């Protein structure tokens, strides 16, 4: 029951950076195979299908109290903050660069997922830390920067 979500995708993205190839060349090699395996595991084990989003914990029923909020400890939400979910998005984009046919649908899914964090009810409009449907929460410049990148 460890929070390996971010570490898994950071590792997968790092592995992909070493196997970048021309678009017409099929990807091969152990780095690409590892990136695909990690992507598949995170997609299968951390995805919360009813929202099209991801959990920060496995199993998804694990809900530790988090104590890094100014107003005290809270129980974790059913889905992740925006920034780790953006790591999944980045991994999907990196894999789609190598194999657009296989991973293009994942990128499309992630575009829809990220939009769930978009808050246009406050000015200026921007992406908030949790999906809008789960309530109004803080918006951070670095989250919005990650989405922009």
Identify the function of each model-found stretch:
Residues 1-27:
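Bacterial Sec-dependent N-terminal signal peptides
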